From Swiss-Prot:
The record marks R101 as: Transition state stabilizer. It comes from the Bacteria. Homodimer or homotetramer. Gene3D superfamilies: 1.10.520.10, Peroxidase, domain 2 (1.10.420.10). This is Catalase-peroxidase. Binds 1 heme b (iron(II)-protoporphyrin IX) group per dimer. Heme b binds at H267. Belongs to the peroxidase family. Peroxidase/catalase subfamily. There is a cross-link at Y226-M252 (Tryptophyl-tyrosyl-methioninium (Tyr-Met) (with W-104)). Bifunctional enzyme with both catalase and broad-spectrum peroxidase activity. Its cofactor is heme b.
Length: 738
């Protein structure tokens, strides 16, 4: 396989320059982004996925999976592995290493900071990922799998197939896999992701200070999955490479041991391809290729254009003596030789055994009469030269079985990291073991509460002395940690009472502990009186929010029932990966009018990002903010954005007063980011607000929604829309209901 890190969104400024140039040259009509490049984009909230899906709105992939013949699929995949095609011959007669790289690069874009990337959705099929330099030649791997996808149709997603192919390839080459979970559904259009600020491939403007990687990025250069295999910026320094590796893999939630296992295990298979200079031979990437190429790119005009003439990363050679078998040879070779720097035929920097040793060790991938020396990359030598990595590789050099187990677990984590909890795992290959990185929750060993119990609990909660604000804030804090990007967070597990979530500034830890103590008392009293039926704290927290909203709606003259579905359980601290869960902490949450000091992103932009992570649309975001303001759900208890004289009542007052022309808004003279709403005639301060409030009046799209909710005939509609959006957030992590 290729090295694991060989050599679309541009920044707004770069896009604008490019757009302006293109329009000047071609006469294209300027769009809104051209005229107003700094306007708030609501694109992350557009729900166009259903309209883009040709399978129809009623298609359910999990249902379709029930008809998948997994054993037949595995058999077919194993046949593909050794059925070498003339248009793209298999190295060593086996496509397994090629498919491992395919699977790795499908999953390896995942980054822990915002949960974006990963294999779910099959995004490698679309730009920009299909044309990243790091993904060169993987278009051919997908075409090799196309007959499999055609045969199994809707019962097998591309997302699952892209990951399964490499996993079965490893198994077919003698590696004992942990297992595999189906359940990744396909998207039908590319996700808009900020992959970096650079305007050119393989460039780097994402580091600061002592080569600290900017957030939220995981890769070190534009168009890479992880790091430059030749070393940072092509500098063949293994220690410097180790720094980059640790950062990049750490951004994916991998420990040192997992990182070493993945690199050493992955490079046990296959080879790198650099038979010629890419600039002399290789054509445009798939997205830029001519129409007759039909979605294939990187056409190679040198020699055969494939096989022994293949050009992918520019690096050339294999690491082991048996590249199509699982062996211990990578680590053996790493320590058996002293390595000296050389260059590949393409001019890339790589390493070979010193003094011309072992030149007859590695078989050629296509010509049985030829043999070669093994290679190492600068990033491979980092596993020997970095002190921490060296301890690991030396231990595994002496214990091949431990190395095998470590790689199996790390591979499973790599390829399932963005799937969320085990409840989303489907199929007969799912392992029985669970891992802390899956954010597990216990299985309930008691009877769930019924309607009568719900009524009793609501009454007890409302009689507990907690305010509407207390209950709404706590329920929101518990559920709104959820991210649709990697299905982490949410109310299930009641992790709001555990580290690190209990200490997040946005959750106001002291107030939170006060509220949780009362709710735990309600839970304890109920469970004490019931033998078989129990309630979790996770359910009590969500139920408290529902009860408070129903009471607030009643105050406003609306009799409503907030949907509630019991079944959540309470996780333990041991079930919570504190270090990775910490990345879910919001530094800005416009729904609670919270913005951490020093956080650079504009509060309005951060609000849209938070809404996107929750899977909300623009109307849902608008309804929630308007409702949460009048219910006094601000994190710090401030009155910013509380545009009502009747706080605690679920009214449309936020919108009525926001669009009221008797108010004129001015920036505060004393506090940055704060605005004052003055009576237009008297000049008296009526309200205070942040940009997370006023954006609903200044942005034309959001104002249209706000004006709608301000109408006299929209009060009932607003209340119901708020409840619907609230319930969507409360049940976002309830995959058992979907």
């Amino acid at each position: 396989m290729e090295p694991l890190f060989p050599k679309r969104l541009l920044s707004i400024a770069v896009l604008c320059v490019a757009s302006a140039t293109a329009q000047a040259d071609t006469g294209m009509n300027p769009d809104n982004d051209y005229w107003w490049p700094n306007r708030l984009s609501l694109e992350p909230l557009r729900d166009s996925s259903l309209s883009a899906d040709p399978r129809g709105a009623n298609f359910d992939y999990n249902e379709a999976l029930k008809d998948l013949d997994v054993e037949a699929l595995k058999k077919d995949l194993k046949q593909v592995m050794t059925a070498s095609q003339d248009w793209w011959p298999a190295d060593y007669g086996h496509y397994g290493p090629f498919f491992i790289r395919l699977s790795w690069h499908a999953a390896g874009t995942y980054r822990m900071i915002d949960g974006r990337g990963g294999a779910d959705g099959g995004m490698q099929r679309f730009a920009p990922l299909n044309s990243w330099p790091d993904n060169a030649s993987l278009d051919k791997a997908r075409r090799l799998l196309q007959p499999i996808k055609q045969k199994y149709g809707n019962n097998l997603s591309w997302s699952d197939l892209l990951v399964l192919a490499g996993t079965i390839g490893m198994e077919d080459m003698g590696f004992p896999i942990v297992g595999f979970a189906f359940g990744r559904d396909d998207e039908w259009e590319p996700e808009e992701v900020n992959w970096g600020p650079e305007g050119q491939w393989l460039t780097d403007r994402r580091h600061s200070g002592d080569r600290k990687l900017d957030k939220p990025f995981g890769a070190t250069e534009m168009g890479l999955i992880y790091v430059n295999p030749e070393g940072p910026h092509g500098n063949p320094d293994p220690i410097a490479a180790a720094h980059d590796i640790r950062q990049a893999f750490g951004r994916m939630g991998m420990s040192d041991e997992e990182t070493v296992a993945l690199i050493a295990g992955g490079h046990t298979f296959g080879k790198a391809h650099g038979a010629h200079k890419p600039s002399d031979c290789v054509g445009a990437d798939p997205e830029a290729a001519s129409m007759e190429e039909q979605g294939l790119g990187w056409t190679n005009k040198c020699g055969k254009g494939n096989a022994e003439d293949t050009v992918t990363s520019g690096l050339e050679g294999a690491w082991t003596v048996s590249p199509a078998e699982w062996t211990h040879n990578f680590l053996q070779n790493l320590y058996a030789f002293e390595w000296e720097l050389t260059t590949s035929p393409a001019g890339a920097k790589q390493w070979v055994p010193k003094g011309g040793a072992a030149t007859n060790m590695v078989p050629d991938a296509h010509d049985s009469s030829k043999r070669h020396a093994p290679i190492m990359l600068t990033t491979d030598l980092a596993l020997k030269e970095d002190p921490a990595y060296r301890k690991i590789t030396q231990r595994w050099l002496e214990d091949p079985e431990e190395f095998t187990r470590a790689f199996a677990r790390a591979w499973f984590k790599l390829t399932h990291r963005d799937m969320g909890p085990v409840s989303r795992y489907k199929g007969e290959l799912v392992p029985s073991d669970t891992f802390v990185w899956q954010d597990p929750v216990p299985v309930a060993d008691y009877k769930q509460i019924g309607e009568r119990d719900v009524k009793k609990l609501k009454a007890a909660i409302l009689d507990s002395g907690l305010s509407t604000s207390d209950l709404v804030k706590t329920a929101w804090a518990s559920a709104a940690s959820f991210r649709t990007t990697d299905m982490r967070g949410g109310a299930n597990g009641a992790r709001i009472r555990l580290a690190p979530q209990k200490d997040w500034a946005v959750n106001q830890p002291q107030d939170l502990q006060r509220v949780l103590k009362v709710l735990e008392g309600v839970q304890r009293e109920f469970n004490k009186k019931s033998r078989k039926t129990k309630v979790s704290l996770a359910d009590v927290i969500v139920l408290g929010g529902a009860a408070a909203i129903e009471q607030a709606a009643k105050k406003a003259g609306h009799k409503v029932e907030v949907p509630f579905f019991p079944g959540r359980t309470d996780a333990s601290q041991e079930m919570t990966d504190v270090s990775t869960f910490a990345w879910l902490e919001p530094k800005s949450d416009g729904f609670r009018n919270f913005h951490a000091e020093g956080y650079k992103r504009n509060p309005a932009e951060a609000l849209v990002e938070r809404a996107a992570l929750l899977g909300l649309t623009a109307p849902e975001m608008t309804a929630l903010v308007g409702g949460l303001r009048v219910l006094q759900a601000n994190a710090d208890g401030s009155q910013h954005g509380v545009f009502t004289d009747n706080p605690g009542s679920l009214t449309n007052d936020f919108f009525v007063n926001l669009v009221d022309m008797s108010t004129v808004w001015k920036k505060s003279d004393t506090e940055a980011g704060l605005y004052k709403g003055l009576d237009r005639n008297s000049g008296k301060v009526k309200w205070t607000a942040t940009s997370a409030d006023l954006i609903f009046g200044s942005n034309s799209e959001l104002r249209a929604i706000a004006e709608y909710y301000s109408q006299s005939d929209s009060q009932k509609t607003f209340v119901q829309d708020f409840i619907n959006a609230w319930s969507k957030v409360m049940t976002a992590d309830r995959f058992d209901l979907k």
